[in-house]
Amino acid sequence: MWSSIISFLFFSVALCQPLLFQKRSSNVSDFISFNASLPNVTIFAMGGTIAGYASSSTETVDYAAGSVGIATLVDAVPAIKNFSNIRGVQVTNVGSEELTPANVLNLTQLILAEVAKPDVHGIVVTHGTDSLEETAIFLDMTVNTTKPIVVVGAMRPSTAISADGPMNLLNAVVVAASNRSIGRGTMILLNDRIGSAFYTTKTNGNMLDTFKSYEAGFLGMILDQRPHFFYSPATPTGKVHFDVSNTTELPAVEILYGYQGLNPNLAKAAVDLGAKGLVLAGMGAASWTDPGNEVIDGLISNQSIPVVYSHRTMDGFSDYYYNGIPAYFQNPQKARYMLMLSINAGYSIQNITDIFSLEY
């Protein structure tokens, strides 16, 4: 009896301890393990809190994001090897606030090459949560495949007690390896919930359950390493795919924030500095001031600058657009990438309007 109690106590204490990492090469060129009966999943690592490191196991704020390599992350979750063969690619290792469109374009082109391989079943991207939704929607609109792509992150660094990253990573691999995930577009997975990249957004800067999809709802959840989807495979209505396989640079698009007494000349300044399009994070359902609208109208009429009216609120529908383009359901950060891709494709303002209206 005592041996059972001691074993239970030891197991309970072990569950509370932070993961202890043994550093090794951050790149995994070959499959870490291979079982012919398991699907192949490639993990592209971008950094972020999921790869964060702190000197204390109780530190969840003052840590270094992007400090742990993909091989070490996979080593910390040995159960992954029960669900798939894993190959890891360290694309970069930084906090996601440091990522640029060039980084995301590079990631996209790497994934395009990977999903073209017939033996690859799915893709996982480990990523910082600050800009995770931006990368996710970019992939959703540029990687035209039925193979599962799952973007995953964490809200606690890898060294923290009860770090959420290991379970999130395991769940992401399980979803990417599942046939049930085929044909669902790019997905975001944290905290046992599976969301569409098109509609899922980060809502809280600190809490574990930060990623939400308020209006569209989640695609499903994962329980006991089994994905449970609420609906048959489908992608968002009106979603357009853009070909960036040969793109080397994306046009600059800036976001301007709406507030009382905003300076309308900031829009002119952004264009003068090279912006090819603007996204306005308007008040309420995308309201912009009258002086601001006059400046925007001039940019549209005189310089053919496409301007998208979005909202600074957490969620909602933006059909206020003056003479610009309504963002409808997209928030500013996602609207920015949609506009960048549309401009890059050479679409007219009417084409872009149709894309945002989900009627293209």
UniProtKB/Swiss-Prot annotation:
Annotated residues for binding of substrate: S96, T129, D130
SMART domains in UniProt: Asparaginase
GO biological process: asparagine catabolic process
Entry-linked Pfam families: Asparaginase (PF00710), Asparaginase_C (PF17763)
Glycosylated position list: N27, N35, N40, N82, N106, N144, N179, N246, N302, N351
A molecular-function term among this protein's GO annotations: asparaginase activity
Name of the protein: Probable L-asparaginase 3
Source species of the chain: Schizosaccharomyces pombe (strain 972 / ATCC 24843) (Fission yeast)
